[in-house]
Amino acid sequence: MNDPFIVALDFSSGKEVRTFLQPFSHTSLFVKVGMELYYQEGPAIIHSLKEQGHRIFLDLKLHDIPNTVKRAMQGLARLEVDLVNVHAAGGTRMMEAALEGLEAGTPNGARRPYCIAVTQLTSTSEQMLHNELWIGRTMEETVLHYAALAKQSGLDGVVCSAKEVPLIRKHCGEAFLTVTPGIRFADDEKNDQVRVVTPYEAKKLGASFIVIGRSITRAENPIAAYERLQQEWKGEEKK
């Protein structure tokens, strides 16, 4: 998984996805399929994207009792996607069960999907962490604790804000994947995410992968927006 860009397909239908991807017909993308799209289209959208040569992050954020997560992951592994995730808040036993399910469900000769854990959603503020979730630690402490649990459980990495990447790399190692949503161009609106950075800032902070959605999918010219993403990652933004 060398390409650091993951394009979030935040659509509710396969038709919208096909319309968006049409200009990319000769490009293999790394795309994210989330709840909205998967719950509407099911496994068919995964098969379609794979046939087009795209790599897939299936972003369903599983969080349930260990046995349920194990069986769910066993089924998802058969789709042969590249990356799946769980909520770290489910605990070590649940995360270990997720890996067991992936190992059991991965077809012979195939590589099991990478599995990462969500630490805290990028829509979660420090105030929300304390006042609504009743977590009495700082955001940084909470994220690091969850990342450590994910590593202890054998997971391949975490989903986190880019601002938390340096701390996670320090404590969990350079090989531990950091997948960072909340990526916006400098002139974009933040929308419902509060812990956001630009592509180049994420690179400087050491992110393994960045997830970017509306900045590309809602752009008037998605190809130009994707090229801008590549330029910003290199620190070569056009003026």
Curated annotation (Swiss-Prot):
* Known pathway: Pyrimidine metabolism; UMP biosynthesis via de novo pathway; UMP from orotate: step 2/2
State the encoding gene.
pyrF
Family, similarity comment: Belongs to the OMP decarboxylase family. Type 1 subfamily.
Determine if Lyase is one of this entry's keywords: yes
Any idea which residues are catalytic in this one?
A: 61
The record ties this protein, via Pfam families, to:
OMPdecase
Look up the EC number in the record and give it.
4.1.1.23
The protein's enzyme class: lyase
Q: Which organism is it from?
A: Geobacillus sp. (strain WCH70)
Taxonomic lineage from the root:
Bacteria, Bacillati, Bacillota, Bacilli, Bacillales
Which residues make up the binding site for substrate? Answer: 10, 32, 59-68, 122, 184, 193, 213-214
Summary of the function given for this chain in its UniProt record? Catalyzes the decarboxylation of orotidine 5'-monophosphate (OMP) to uridine 5'-monophosphate (UMP).
State the protein's name. Answer: Orotidine 5'-phosphate decarboxylase
- Residue ranges of the TM segments: none
InterPro entries, sorted: Aldolase_TIM (IPR013785), OMPdecase (IPR014732), OMPdecase_AS (IPR018089), OMPdecase_bac (IPR047596), OMPdeCOase_dom (IPR001754), RibuloseP-bd_barrel (IPR011060)
Q: Which GO terms describe its biological process?
A: 'de novo' pyrimidine nucleobase biosynthetic process; 'de novo' UMP biosynthetic process
Give a GO molecular function annotation for the protein: orotidine-5'-phosphate decarboxylase activity
Q: Which domain of life is it from?
A: Bacteria
State how it assembles: Homodimer.
Alphabetized, the UniProt keywords read: Decarboxylase, Lyase, Pyrimidine biosynthesis
